[in-house]
Design a protein with these regions (language model features):
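N-terminal loops that bind phosphate or other acidic moieties
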Residues: 1-343
Length: 343
């Protein structure tokens, strides 16, 4: 990872795309934020007219032993159940990927049990669940970096298959707790401000969850100036791998679409490791989780819609894929003012 370089956002390509948009057969700037999205995609890819015929979502799965303390509405075993469901095509993310024409890869980076019998699963297990960070570090620094490398490697493998648009998804019961911890440490917001209902827990359990997060931060004392330290002490394997996918995608000029709260926490880690990643990411939706918009505002990454989502899996990110297709089709398929006879 030390040799990973992030290319600069191409102002030249972005400006060329904006000039092209302004000369198309429509009222100037009349497509609003769709045009902003097209310009951002041009700058990320370095191409005036980018295209994304091959799209992918990489979903990283891991468990969290803090889930054993009742921070989630379901038990830790649901992570494995959903992984098995995803590889069979039965999840929300599967349906949304089919709708968007995107391929889904499901990667075991830290599920509690071994899943040797699961066909179609990408096996990159670094550990058998993150440790309970309310009692000590979730991972060693070496484990965290190994998980980040899994994500970088997956970005490279997807690129080798011809993928030009990526999103990072996740499955991990209890993973809003490390996401809240990361958000609090990196943004300076209070734990209460960034801790929500997650999988649908009642208010008294939200308070319990926030208390555990506060204790974990106090015990581990993560250094906000060292993103890997934060990741190792209060993060988790799938968060690390997601940040790696963002780092890897950015290094290859592949736009990576950021999903909701957990992906936002992973983005904060990726940007902490390589600040240039910020300009190479695409926001998607504003999550119901209170910490999400705090994170995205802190990172300076705009979001494009609010459907009241809080599922994760990469579902909000892949919903943006058809809008991305529409944005780039404007650049490549619309006629110009001159082309319709206007002077």
């Amino acid at each position: 990872m030390n040799t990973l370089t992030i290319p600069a956002f191409s102002a030249e390509a972005a400006e060329a795309a904006q000039r092209r948009l302004d000369n198309l057969a429509k009222v100037p700037r009349s497509l609003g934020r769709i045009e902003e999205l097209a310009v951002r995609l041009a700058g990320i890819t370095g191409k005036e007219c980018p295209a994304f015929p091959e799209k992918s979502v990489v979903l990283f799965a891991a468990d969290h032993d803090i889930a054993l303390q009742g921070v989630s509405a379901t038990g830790q075993e649901v992570t494995e159940m959903q992984v098995r469901n995803f590889v069979k095509g039965g999840g929300t993310i599967n349906a949304f990927c089919r709708n968007a024409g995107a391929r889904l890869s499901v990667v075991d980076v830290g599920v509690k049990n071994d899943l040797d019998d699961v066909e179609g699963l990408v096996r990159r297990k670094v550990m058998h669940a993150a440790r309970d960070f309310s009692e000590g570090p979730a991972m060693t620094r070496e484990e965290a970096l190994a998980c980040v490398q899994v994500g970088i490697d997956m970005a490279r493998e997807e690129a080798a298959r011809g993928v030009t648009l990526l999103a990072a998804g996740e499955m991990g019961i209890g993973n809003t707790s490390p996401s809240s911890a990361i958000a609090a440490v990196l943004t300076g917001a209070s734990v209460d401000e960034v801790t929500g209902i997650g999988s649908g827990i009642p208010s008294e359990r939200v308070r319990h969850k926030a208390g555990l997060i506060r204790r974990g931060i106090a015990i581990n004392r993560p250094n906000p100036s060292d993103a890997v330290d934060v990741l190792a002490k209060v993060g988790g394997p799938e968060l690390a791998a997601m940040s790696g996918l963002m780092l890897g995608g950015a290094s290859l000029r592949i736009p990576v679409v950021v999903d909701g709260f957990i992906a936002g926490a992973a983005a904060a880690i990726a940007i902490g490791i390589r600040p240039g990643v910020r300009d190479m990411l695409i926001g998607s939706h504003s999550s119901v989780e209170p910490g999400h918009q705090i994170l995205m505002d802190y990172l300076g990454i705009p979001t494009y819609f609010d459907f009241g989502l809080r599922l994760g899996e990469g579902t909000g990110a892949v919903l943006l894929y058809p809008i991305i297709d529409a944005a780039v089709r404007i650049l490549t398929e619309m006629n110009t003012l001159q082309g319709i006879g206007m002077k």
